[in-house]
């Protein structure tokens, strides 16, 4: 829901700001300070910075630890990849979207590059946050494993996928495509065609095919409404089960 392209489908909850950050993103509400008001109460905000503190401890100290060099490089890479991921979540939830012309002056978020309880927090610009995210990813990717120890740790495909998404959010489409193609080189990941998978389920559970009609009633504007700049892509004519709102220019 970061960019307002896919979000919660319930009209009343969006319009009434039941979940403020979802509504802010969907409605592109850039009222000054509105996102920042929710940092104190947001579980996402506190948990991301808590995890970042742990990653900073690893980044600062792993090279001084005992053990094989390969293990140290792996720990460093995975910590930086996850630090980048958490900063990406934070900057897209609590700051303005990346716009090349204004990113250097748009207020971003606080960056903690080291674990230091005495250090005074500093707010960085959106551009500086994205630069730091990309710096971490570029450093991490060469040492990320093709297959991690378990699914809770980042893999090489994760690193490339996150890099692709960062490029996408910056509007760097060629770079996003190239990074995405690197993901598909993985032995352990592939693209799924969800439509035939859905139809296989419908064949076994026929009532599923009627659920999209109910979801369609939550549309914030009718499909033909001139104010509706979005297509309810997964609920139009193809019978897919869940309504994702996709901006018209994305489909065009």
Indicate residue ranges for each PLM-predicted region:
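Hydrophobic-face positions in mid-chain alpha helices that act as interaction patches
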Residues: 177-252
């Amino acid at each position: 829901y970061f960019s307002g392209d896919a979000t919660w489908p319930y009209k009343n909850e969006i319009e009434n700001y039941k979940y403020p950050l979802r509504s802010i993103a969907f409605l592109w509400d850039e009222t000054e300070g509105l996102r920042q008001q929710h940092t104190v109460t947001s579980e996402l905000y506190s948990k991301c910075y808590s995890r970042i503190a742990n990653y900073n401890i690893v980044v600062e100290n792993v090279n001084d630890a005992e053990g094989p060099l390969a293990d140290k490089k792996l720990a460093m890479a995975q910590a930086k990849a996850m630090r980048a991921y958490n900063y990406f979540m934070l900057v897209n939830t609590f700051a303005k979207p990346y716009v090349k012309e204004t990113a250097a002056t748009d207020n971003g978020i606080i960056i903690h590059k080291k674990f230091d309880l005495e250090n005074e927090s500093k707010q960085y610009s959106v551009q500086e946050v994205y630069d730091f995210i990309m710096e971490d990813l570029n450093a991490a990717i060469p040492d990320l494993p093709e297959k991690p120890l378990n699914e809770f740790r980042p893999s090489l495909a994760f690193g490339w996928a996150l890099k692709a998404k960062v490029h996408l959010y910056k509007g760097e489409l060629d770079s996003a495509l190239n990074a995405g193609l690197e993901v598909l080189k993985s032995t352990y990941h592939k693209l799924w065609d969800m439509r035939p998978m859905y139809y296989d389920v419908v064949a076994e559970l026929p009532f599923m095919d009627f659920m999209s009609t109910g979801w369609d009633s939550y549309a914030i504007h009718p499909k033909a409404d001139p104010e509706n700049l979005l297509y309810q892509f997964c609920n139009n004519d193809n019978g897919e089960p869940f309504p994702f709102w996709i901006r018209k220019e994305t489909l065009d």
